[in-house]
Amino acid sequence: MHFNSDFKYAYENGGEITRSFLDALPEDWKNEPLVFDSRVHMLMPGWYPAIPGWHHDDVPRAEIPTGQHFITGGQPDYDNPRYKSEHILGLVNAEICPTEFAIGNCLMPKIKEGDLIYREWHKEVELLIEDNILQKHECEDRYLYHFDWQAFHSGTKAISNGWRWFGRVSRNTERVNKVTNEIRVNCQVYLEFPMEGW
């Protein structure tokens, strides 16, 4: 699994799935600075491969003031973003646990100072879906999905047993200036009811 890798490093050190994903990218993406992340999860029904909840990827955050908790100190800066990131996502075995996007246009409410943006906006997106202002779209297996810093999406809980591969490249982000080319050997899952056992 790759974390914060550039294209060349990911291609040279990735397996067949990683190289297939990178080969399928649009040519203009391959020639720009980008950062690649991937994860492989062994999932069981009810497990989440990512923290669930409607959110955006890589919206610039303010520096965290000394002594302040990262959750409230480093909230996304939607008013004056330093950059506007773009991403391409792909899944293998998506049917086990698809990423969902909320498609459509909406205006989100301003959040009070100190409140958590995505905690509040998650509830708002759910209402917008219920009112058919936004529509849910489940990512399909082995497709590329291009989205940007304003595309609401969420991880979902697994509905069956199996392995799931997730890959994402990002550009127009400060992360391309901080590439670390890491290979990670484990990743976590999240449980809704951790004491129920398995």
Model-derived features with residue positions:
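Signature of the catalytic double-stranded beta-helix
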Residues: 1-86
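Short, flexible loop/turn elements at secondary-structure junctions
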Residues: 40, 56-60, 92-96, 149-151, ...
